[in-house]
């Protein structure tokens, strides 16, 4: 157990028996009231966001974590099969553990898996940006190039991304895995 004042953004704590990642932690000292810490956390099992007010003297249980690099190999039913980059051990990871970023996982991508002190998978971190090929989008016309709108495109992983009008089938684009937004066209 450690004081809430020693916890920082990104720490994983046990809150009400469940692992939560601290997304923001702000110290507040209102007028004539006692100081407190306002925390925004995300439950790593359910994915729900939780807001909680800790007193300045409160203690929390910080979970000791281990981060390892894994490479995606293939799908096995509803699970993703990953291989440890150093020991070549394989593990199965559920889609729920990966979250919404699972739509950008492609063969050979390297992910970081966060394990708890008891060996359970807490979260899976994708690279911030991935490069994917556009497989299906509407053809561009001469008028489209003069406007600055977007159009939907299907990428090689099956995800749908809104792209600028100039992007065509076969183009390689960089996408932000956190939001699913188009970043830029990659020139190869």
Curated annotation (Swiss-Prot):
UniProt keyword Cytoplasm present: yes
Gene Ontology BP terms: peptide biosynthetic process
Gene Ontology molecular function terms on file: translation elongation factor activity
Pathway info: Protein biosynthesis; polypeptide chain elongation
GO CC annotations on file: cytoplasm
Record keywords, A-Z: Cytoplasm, Elongation factor, Protein biosynthesis
Alphabetical list of Pfam families matching this protein: EFP, EFP_N, Elong-fact-P_C
Localization, UniProt: Cytoplasm
Domain of life: Bacteria
SUPFAM superfamilies per record: Nucleic acid-binding proteins, Translation proteins SH3-like domain
Family note: Belongs to the elongation factor P family.
Protein function: Involved in peptide bond synthesis. Stimulates efficient translation and peptide-bond synthesis on native or reconstituted 70S ribosomes in vitro. Probably functions indirectly by altering the affinity of the ribosome for aminoacyl-tRNA, thus increasing their reactivity as acceptors for peptidyl transferase.
NCBIfam families for the chain: efp, PRK00529.1
Name used for this protein in its record: Elongation factor P
Species this protein is from: Chlorobium phaeovibrioides (strain DSM 265 / 1930) (Prosthecochloris vibrioformis (strain DSM 265))
């Amino acid at each position: 157990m450690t004081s809430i004042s020693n916890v920082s953004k990104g720490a994983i704590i046990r809150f009400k028996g469940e692992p939560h990642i601290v997304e923001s932690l702000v110290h507040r000292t209102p007028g004539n009231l006692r100081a407190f810490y306002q925390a925004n956390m995300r439950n790593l099992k359910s994915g729900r966001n939780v807001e909680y007010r800790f007193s300045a003297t409160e203690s929390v249980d910080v979970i000791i974590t281990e981060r390892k690099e894994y490479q995606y190999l293939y799908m096995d039913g509803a699970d993703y099969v990953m291989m440890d980059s150093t020991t070549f051990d394989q593990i199965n990871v559920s889609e729920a553990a990966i979250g919404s970023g699972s739509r950008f996982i492609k063969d050979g991508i390297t992910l970081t898996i966060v394990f708890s002190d008891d060996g359970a998978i807490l979260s899976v971190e994708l690279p911030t940006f991935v490069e994917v090929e556009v497989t299906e989008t509407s053809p561009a016309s001469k008028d489209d190039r003069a406007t600055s709108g977007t159009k939907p495109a299907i990428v090689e992983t099956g995800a749908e991304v809104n792209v600028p009008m100039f992007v065509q089938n076969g183009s390689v684009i960089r996408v932000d895995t956190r939001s699913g937004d188009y970043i830029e066209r990659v020139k190869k």
